[in-house]
């Protein structure tokens, strides 16, 4: 039995949960928005007296793998519609800047042309000095968008210039020693 999968999920009062039996489709609605996800038929979700219990239909390898994952995904949906998720990135480097213009994030990263990224309906972007704050209700979408921003200019190991997550430690390398 999965240690994570067998834990119950408590549903807050302000969250509405709708479950479809025939195709294992779950809709979670809360104060921040609405999320929906389809789960495997090898997983059974039960809702009883304000708690969600995730069980597997059989003991196959696939069902065991999906058990803990499904429970965590449902928990993340509930946290997302009540509190939301956010990731903070910081820009290091001379002349590296980020600006927000409408629904567009403009990154000046030392390339010939500024890099432009567009907001989606699930994601909100805020720029505060050298920090970029990515927030939204879908944890997967927030993490992916933040990873896409970081991929535009990952931190390099010699000077540490680039885009990194807040608090991320960049392993530094020693440069050339030169001729003696």
Predicted regions, residues:
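N-terminal intrinsically disordered, cationic/polar leader segments
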Residues: 2-67, 71-146, 151, 156-180
